[in-house]
Amino acid sequence: MTTIAIFTKNVLLAIAFALFAQGAAIPDPAKRDDNPGFVALDFEVTRKPLDVNATSELSKRSSPSSPLYFEGPSYGIRVSVGSNKQEQQVVLDTGSSDFWVVDSSASCQKGNCKQYGTFDPHSSTSFKSLGSSFRSIGYGDKSSSIGTWGQDTIYLGGTSITNQRFADVTSTSVNQGILGVGRVETESANPPYDNVPITLKKQGKIKTNAYSLYLNSPGAATGTIIFGGVDNAKYSGKLIEEPLVSDRYLAVNLKSLNYNGDNSNAGFGVVVDSGTTISYLPDSIVNDLANKVGAYLEPVGLGNELYFIDCNANPQGSASFTFDNGAKITVPLSEFVLQSTANACVWGLQSSDRQNVPPILGDNFLRHAYAFQLDKETVLSRSGEVHFCLKCFSNLETSIVWKAFFYNRYIQ
């Protein structure tokens, strides 16, 4: 989910973690420190057809207009809250920064907001109310959440953090709680507070405020987020560092877009957001590519138009996104053909001009990028191909590679 003001994420297309090239030895896992400096969590992918009949997720956070809403995949992480470890599944969101859960007595304004777990603050002996009200940053589809701020112990896999600030939501039109891992500048509170990634670092669970996000293949049921590290099985070669171009959101500068040999100069900032299903770029780029693959504009109500494409279309080739420091991310054009609730498929690269939103690179791009370093305000992107191997983790601060014997399934 993304704020519209200046969507940007700290994007690092990373300096290599190639200790092998430097002759460094891999530490023996049996002698592994109890705190390797990273926290690895799997998340579950929930998929729905793209809904083109409502207002947009992209108009969140005070957008001047309401573009169309695309309810695509969401990424659910299991966390536990409180002294009695009350389990929730919350949506992982790189475009927002607050962590909130659904109260056990909450009023659900839309759907069943309690289906993924609830929190009863009265049953946790470690819960402390902070006595102030919470209201989520506004969404263009009119969804919202209200509640109160509190703090408690949060359990993330085998790791826990204490006195973490979060919101206990008592009324919501959102179907699930949210774990926002964006920058503190997009928090709902003023002044800002230490959100989950910052607390993980301050309490010594990770060595740097960074995370790598692996969305896996388009049809996969799971993905992985690693706070404080990267998975070396997910890339070859090096990671290239790209600086953020906003002091508020996770955004980098897109230099050019090449598709099947045709090059379009860009030279503008793009937001990178896991909460946005598709990608949005200016008319000058989108229209040309749409014509080449056979996508066509159709009215969809409320004065909006969208690009659709025949669901049987199988556009060949790829789109390559090049950034300022030379990072190049290649996405197969076939991944831009997305099922929807309409009679045709939605083309996954829409016009930011027509939708009146900033340029955004969503899930169909992020799947091919990799890591975010919030401390250094950069994004890390993988270069080269991904190979089958056991998952090997690198601490982003020390670049020491651990063979993760405790996490031993092969990449699929």
Curated annotation (Swiss-Prot):
Recorded catalytic reaction(s): these are: Preferential cleavage at the carboxyl of hydrophobic amino acids, but fails to cleave 15-Leu-|-Tyr-16, 16-Tyr-|-Leu-17 and 24-Phe-|-Phe-25 of insulin B chain. Activates trypsinogen, and degrades keratin
Sorted alphabetically, the keyword list is: Aspartyl protease, Cleavage on pair of basic residues, Disulfide bond, Glycoprotein, Hydrolase, Protease, Secreted, Signal, Zymogen
Propeptide positions: 26-61
PTMs per UniProt: O-glycosylated.
Q: List the GO biological process terms.
A: proteolysis
Which PROSITE patterns would you find in this protein's record? ASP_PROTEASE (PS00141), PEPTIDASE_A1 (PS51767)
Q: List the disulfide bonds.
A: 108-113, 311-345
Q: What is its EC number?
A: 3.4.23.24
- Residues of the signal sequence? 1-25
SUPFAM superfamilies attached to this UniProt entry? Acid proteases
Peptidase A1 domain residues are 75-383
- Name the record gives this protein: Candidapepsin-2
Which species expresses this protein natively?
A: Candida parapsilosis
Encoded by which gene? Answer: SAPP2
